């Protein structure tokens, strides 16, 4: 929004001036019967951001020393505090002042807004003689009507801008943008207004905003309402395929809008995906733990298998040793059994054949040699066989002596004893 100060409108520039003007005075030559049209640019810019309030001194000529000027000054004081006050009363007062001046007076005031800040003050006074008062009254009334229309145009066009701006903002904008005044002149000329007292109403928020705010009111989701919502979502194929419009149609709840369903559906989706993510993390943690446990278990199993193989090897070695020992024991048992059988046979033969002693005597040395060899092999049986052999020899000698006393006796060592000695032995 550009704020600029209006300049003299075209309607005022085109007003025909009277040819009977006596003199046109400069600001330094202002007489007593003329009216200054512009008094202070700074005061007018403070009171209104776009158009200055016209101040005129009619007190000396027209007799309005107290009422009109005081009312204008009081309105100016109120403009500083409250810039949003209606200015219809000022417009009516200015119109009445212009009408009074044209009917009974000597001068015709030309109204135009104040120039931009920094421009030199100027005034333009046109004096009209008494005899031309009636002829110029029509031009003055038309001029006043155009002025009123121009003032109403300013109020109608810029009233919203005045409501939005503050007093300080208006001062800064009017001082900073004097060059935009020429560009804003066509906008004032194009607008038309019939009544100067019309004021634009204060803007209020559109009804659409109120409806939107009413539709976006918070709603408490009860467990029953949430269950119906979940049921509708499941009917539509899950939270991904469900749409707020379809859920709203299926729920059929009074006071429930599509905004409520949309927000609740978004929350439902996020709340549903969060446990899945947490479950995925827990599953990943479980898999890592299981892998570590599997590695540990496999290592333990390999170690146990290795120990088991070592134990089995040792057992096999021990079994081989035991088998070899058993074979040796069996061989020794067989050998001992053979020796025992031979001893039994020799003893039975000596007992059953006593008459074969003579024949057995020459074979005794051979038997004794065999027995000596067996005793060498088995020393445990030496003591057992020796007494048996001695008894057998003694018995053989007695039988031989009884049977043949005259036969020479053969000693055990193979030497023959003399006969005398045998007799002595026999007698004794």
Swiss-Prot record:
In its keyword annotation, does this UniProt entry include Ubl conjugation? Answer: no
Q: Where in the cell is it found?
A: Nucleus
Q: Which GO terms describe its molecular function?
A: DNA binding; DNA-binding transcription factor activity
**Which ranges are annotated Low complexity under compositional bias?**
1-10, 176-191
Q: Which residues bind DNA?
A: 244-269
Bias class Polar residues marks the residues at 345-368, 388-405
Q: Which Gene3D superfamilies match?
A: Homeodomain-like
| Chain spans, region Disordered | 1-32, 168-219, 345-428
Q: Which GO terms describe its cellular component?
A: nucleus
Give the record's keywords alphabetically: DNA-binding, Nucleus, Transcription, Transcription regulation
Q: Which SUPFAM superfamilies match?
A: Homeodomain-like (SSF46689)
Identify the Pfam families for this entry: Myb_CC_LHEQLE (PF14379), Myb_DNA-binding (PF00249)
- Domain HTH myb-type residue range list: 213-273
Q: Does the keyword Nucleus feature in the UniProt annotation?
A: yes
Family matches, as InterPro entries? Homeodomain-like_sf (IPR009057), Myb_CC_LHEQLE (IPR025756), Myb_dom (IPR017930), Myb_dom_plants (IPR006447), PHR1-like (IPR046955), SANT/Myb (IPR001005)
Described by its record, this protein's role is as follows: Transcription factor involved in phosphate starvation signaling. Binds to P1BS, an imperfect palindromic sequence 5'-GNATATNC-3', to promote the expression of inorganic phosphate (Pi) starvation-responsive genes. Functionally redundant with PHR2 and PHR3 in regulating Pi starvation response and Pi homeostasis.
Name the chain's protein: Protein PHOSPHATE STARVATION RESPONSE 1
Organism in which the protein naturally occurs: Oryza sativa subsp. indica (Rice)
Q: What gene is it encoded by?
A: PHR1
């Amino acid at each position: 929004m550009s704020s600029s100060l209006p300049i003299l409108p075209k309607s005022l520039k085109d007003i025909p001036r009277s040819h009977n003007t006596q003199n046109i005075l400069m600001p330094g030559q202002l007489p007593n019967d003329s009216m200054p049209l512009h008094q202070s640019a700074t005061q007018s810019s403070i009171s209104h951001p776009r158009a200055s309030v016209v101040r005129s001194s009619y007190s000396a000529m027209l007799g309005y020393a107290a009422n009109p000027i005081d009312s204008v000054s009081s309105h100016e004081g109120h403009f500083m505090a409250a810039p949003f006050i209606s200015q219809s009363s000022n417009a009516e007062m200015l119109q009445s002042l212009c009408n009074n001046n044209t009917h009974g007076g000597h001068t015709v005031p030309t109204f135009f807004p104040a120039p931009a800040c920094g421009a030199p003050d100027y005034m333009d006074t046109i004096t009209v003689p008494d005899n031309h008062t009636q002829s110029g009254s029509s031009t003055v009334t038309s001029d006043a009507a155009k002025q009123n229309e121009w003032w109403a145009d300013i109020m109608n066009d810029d009233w919203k801008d005045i409501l939005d701006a503050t007093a300080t903002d208006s001062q800064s904008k009017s001082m900073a943008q004097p060059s935009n005044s020429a560009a804003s002149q066509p906008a004032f000329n194009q607008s038309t207004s019939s009544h100067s007292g019309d004021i634009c109403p204060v803007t209020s928020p559109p009804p659409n905003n109120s409806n939107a705010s009413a539709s976006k009111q918070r709603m408490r989701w009860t467990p029953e309402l949430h269950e119906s919502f979940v049921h509708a979502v499941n009917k539509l194929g899950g939270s991904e395929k469900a749409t707020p419009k379809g859920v709203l149609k299926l729920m059929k709840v009074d006071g429930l809008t599509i905004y409520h369903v949309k927000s609740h559906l978004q929350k439902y989706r996020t709340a549903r995906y969060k446990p899945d993510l947490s479950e995925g993390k827990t599953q990943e943690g479980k898999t890592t733990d299981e892998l570590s446990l599997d590695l540990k278990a496999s290592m333990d199993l390999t170690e146990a298998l290795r120990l088991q193989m070592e134990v089995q090897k040792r057992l096999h070695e021990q079994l081989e040793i035991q088998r070899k020992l058993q074979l040796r024991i069996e061989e020794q048992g067989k050998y001992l059994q053979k020796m025992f059988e031979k001893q039994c046979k020799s003893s039975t033969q000596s007992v059953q054949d006593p008459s074969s002693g003579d024949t057995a005597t020459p074979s005794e040395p051979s038997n004794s040699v065999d027995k000596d060899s067996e005793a060498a092999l088995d020393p445990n049986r030496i003591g057992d066989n020796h007494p048996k052999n001695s008894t057998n020899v003694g018995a053989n000698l007695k039988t031989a002596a009884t049977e043949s006393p005259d036969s020479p006796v053969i000693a055990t060592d193979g030497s023959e004893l003399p006969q005398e000695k045998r007799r002595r032995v026999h007698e004794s």
